[in-house]
Amino acid sequence: MKRIALLAILAFTSLIAYSKYVIVNVEIPGTLDYEVAKQADWKTVDSLKVIGGINGTDVRTYRRMGRGREPAIVDGSGKHHYYIYNEIAGTYVGNTTEGKLKYLDLSEANIVAGGDAYATAVYDDDEKIVSVGRHTKDCYTEDNVVGSLMLSGEFSEVIFPNSATRIDAWPIGSIAWKSLKKVKVPDSVRVLPEMLLWRFENLESIELPSVLEGIGSQAFSYTKVGFGFKMNIEKFPESLRYIGAGAFYEGSYRIFDDYLKDISNLVYIGNNALQSVDSRSWTSLRMPSVVYLGSHKPDEYGRRQFYNPWEIADLTFSREACKSITDTRILEEIAKKPFFIGQGFFTPVLRSMKVRIDNPEMYGDTICVESKAFKDFSELNLEIPEGQWIRS
């Protein structure tokens, strides 16, 4: 019995020895691996705080410590090659590392250009970063930019650099879909990137900038949160001007409803941006005072507005942007000013609005209607007030 107890103690002691928190000051970019090796075997480090300048070589180092991977070809038949990023370590094709890093703190790190490629991103034919695509490109660091897949690893908590001024699309990748619980984005960043937390399943805490101008496409798409989820803000700030396509599409399960009660300062809402937001909770919602199609119509992903949000005059509701809205009072408020009706905008709420929508007093002077805006409702006879009605 004593022997069994002794072995148990030794085993427990061994586990402690393999769990290490390391603080590293990188004085010369590209030497993170050397600095870590001074303190511990990289395979045993589960918590890492990096101080100083880091380049692509250093990013590659901590990604290896966090079980990051390169993409693997899953179908090389014929002329078509498909690439895919593995979801969770060891569950799909591709090699994994022996790293154990879970906690990554880059708050005092400065990203600088140079060093090796730290990842290979997968793109579709439209040059949009995806999880499965036709071709790949190597990723290199830029000064003060958190690049795509730069934080890709099986991490549970990630703190972005305080010095970062921009975050590119899909910075955390897909490896941490199940493991990531906490994320902190610094105040120095004004725009949340595309696919920031796309498909993450167990989030417990998100810290966002106090001043925020934009939320990129699919930033919180299919996002699920754990019990006791919290954010550091009570609502999205008044500085928020645009929400990209599908930003809250599916999966968020009304978690973000309370944070979207006041969207009166927005200038752009992309396709399906609010698809999963439950409008029934918007009892005191402040809608924008002007809803109008500006000089540049957004593409399918709203990318024109994502990069140049001020090109649009006031506010556009693209197709299906408010698909989930069932409260006609909200639509009446929207319709008090000139507006653009996007494809599928009223689906599936139009039937309940038939009486009200026939009333021309609801509308402003200018109405732009896409050809499929009233799809499946061809029997509806609309009376349009004086002004311009454009059917595109």
Model-derived regions, located:
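Beta-solenoid repeat scaffold
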Residues: R64-L106
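Hydrophobic h-region of N-terminal signal peptides that target proteins for export
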Residues: L10-A17
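Structural signature of tandem-repeat unit edges
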Residues: Y21-E27, D46-I54, K79-Y82, N86, ...
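Boundary/junction segments of secreted and surface-exposed precursor proteins
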Residues: Y18-V36
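N-terminal extracellular ligand-recognition/capping segment immediately after the signal peptide
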Residues: G52-R64
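Leucine-rich repeat
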Residues: E35-D41, Y62-G66, I88-T97, G147-L151, ...
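Positively charged n-region of N-terminal signal peptides that target proteins for export
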Residues: M1-I4
